[in-house]
Amino acid sequence: MGNVSSAVKHCLSYETFLRDYPWLPRLLWEEKCSELPKLPVYVKIVEVGPRDGLQNEKEIVPTEVKIQLIDLLSQTGLPVIEATSFVSSKWVAQMADHTAVLKGIKRSPDVRYPVLTPNIQGFQAAVAAGANEVAVFGSASETFSRKNINCSIEESLQRFEQVVSAAKQEGIPVRGYVSCALGCPYEGQVKPSQVTKVAKRLFELGCYEVSLGDTIGVGTAGSMAEMLSDVLTEVPAGALAVHCHDTYGQALPNILIALQMGVSVVDASVAGLGGCPFAKGASGNVSTEDLLYMLHGLGIETGVDLLKVMEAGDFICKALNRKTNSKVSQATRNN
């Protein structure tokens, strides 16, 4: 995992240990070699609000609002902002303005702006619009795959192979997603081995990073650990990310488990925007604000300014005429 920070180190005085970690047994402090699971020094946050966060909105969000949101997020220190999706407007009408959005944003040289491209037609349209990074979206659930992208898992992987091959010729990096990694709205529980199978294929195809998504937010720390343990037998931690929805309020615990297991890339959405148009009942992604609060509280570097992210969250919530889903923003604004 490279350089790491530790939640508890044996060099702490017992008084400090007792003050900061009163729930831990004295034995842990006494055993010099003992320490809690290690955490990354730095976590890369992939902001998915402009795409995954807005795609489920019932009312069409004006193009200029989407552009302004991305421009605000570009000033926060976020290294990656997923801008839009080059899917058919028949499937996701909210993303029909993808070309205008991608051409309208003020790109920062320090930020990458990937776009979702489900097939070769979407990839070609994205490149024509100026995309310099793309993402493909697969599923660990056969039923979800057919309902979401209208094909089987195997057929989707064949489509992605075309995209990755074309991207290599253009020198464009490709990120992969595996949805339903911890549960499916149609099939229920998903076997970890099935997640591993799809993640491995995406990695072998050439995806530099594979994001494992708890699409409907049913995962627990236990199921996250079980799933990751299996995936890590085939895909290195350095090539993995986690993407957690907060339907049951378990997103942050699940992310913490992933960090302890070596993952250092986390997807999040400003103001906790999101859901899934093909997964009824799924709530938004973990909010970027809440994730930052947890990471900074653990002493983990992100390079992201929490206050500026909150300002971007205020903007989009006002534009959508709704309250933020971020607990941090709620608490701060109420004080």
UniProtKB/Swiss-Prot annotation:
Its EC number is 4.1.3.4. It comes from Danio rerio (Zebrafish). The active site is at C276. SUPFAM superfamilies: Aldolase (SSF51569). Keywords: Acetylation, Cytoplasm, Endoplasmic reticulum, Lipid metabolism, Lipoprotein, Lyase, Membrane, Metal-binding, Myristate. GO terms for biological process: ketone body biosynthetic process; L-leucine catabolic process. The modification N6-acetyllysine is found at K58. This is 3-hydroxy-3-methylglutaryl-CoA lyase, cytoplasmic. The gene is hmgcll1. Its main location: cytoplasm. One of its GO terms (molecular function) is metal ion binding. A divalent metal cation binds at D52, H243, H245, N285. The lineage of its organism: Eukaryota, Metazoa, Chordata, Craniata, Vertebrata.
